[in-house]
Amino acid sequence: MKGMNLQEQKKCGILLIAIGLVIFAYFHHVRQPKIDPVGLSTPPAAGDATPDPAQTTVDPNATVDPDATTDPDAAASSSPDPVDPNDLLGGKYAEKFSTAGVVSDETCYRSEKVALEFRQERRFDSLVHIIDIYIRDVHSLRTNLCQQVFGDRKSIQSLSDLLPGALAISSSDQYSNRNRSIWGLLVSNGLGYSSDTDIFDFAVLFLDGTMEVYEAGQADYDSLVERGIYQAWTFGPVLVKDGAVPDNYDGAPDYIATKNPRVAIGYCEPGHYYLVMVDGTRASESGSAGATLEELSALFLDLGCTQALNLDGGGTVAMSFGGRVLNTSSRNLSSAIYVCEPDAPDVGGNGA
């Protein structure tokens, strides 16, 4: 700034600051960076594991009882068969599915691999949307991260258009915050984005169809990966764990502890899940004020769930079924959970 008078130097300084703010705003608020996932290893199939020498070595000094017999049925029953990710229900709930092509209307969808039942109920002075999910293949329950563009957000209608194979869509967890950073554990369709298990409660869907919920810091990421993570959703709190309601609501912020619009996921057994949305964003229009955590926990117990997690609340709560949007959210979504046929194409590079 040599040769400039004081006023010119001030103008130049202000201009440089303005340029810096524009650059910051572009990278922090406008430009949508891609997030690069890490493919997670899957557990070995049954029979592929290398035997432990300590368990297979024969003691040369051991005596053998000639009258002893081995019961092959007892030996087989000592270790349960692993669940096939492509046949989670093992033949159960056959009446829920259709063997004569797809059958669907405004309240149900039935095919050979997927069965969905949708209903609305009035509970705790609120409108509750319930999707009862039966899937034979774990790859029918997926997450979309808005085409892997971190910070990007879309309306529920836009996601319905983006995911033509989606049979039902629900707003997902709060994996990203308003500061555009990832919160907690994030695994989407077998791809790992964040390994942090210490910030928030979370739910994990494994490749064998089981789902477990954890409070923050209660599980090690590497051990979860060894079991075969397929999805991980973060936010909370835990609503139901091992068939009981945990005592973790004391001291929760008002926006969590009081009545609010909410969306949550529940688990009954491998292949059987629930997505629940409690309306309330526009209480004057819907006559619905939302739900407290205690009310939502009680609902999942009534549904027969042994595990359940609160996924999100407030203005981003949204759901659609059969292409029909069920409510109007005030904010767009950064991610969504959706149900599809297991061979539906992957949209947005989110894995499958």
Regions found by a protein language model. Name each.
Residues 134-137, 205-211, 242, 267-271, ...:
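Short acidic-glycine loop/turn motifs at beta-strand connectors
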Residues 168-172, 213, 307-313:
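General beta-strand structural signal in soluble alpha/beta enzymes
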Residues 179-197, 250-311, 316-352:
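Conserved, well-ordered active-site substructure
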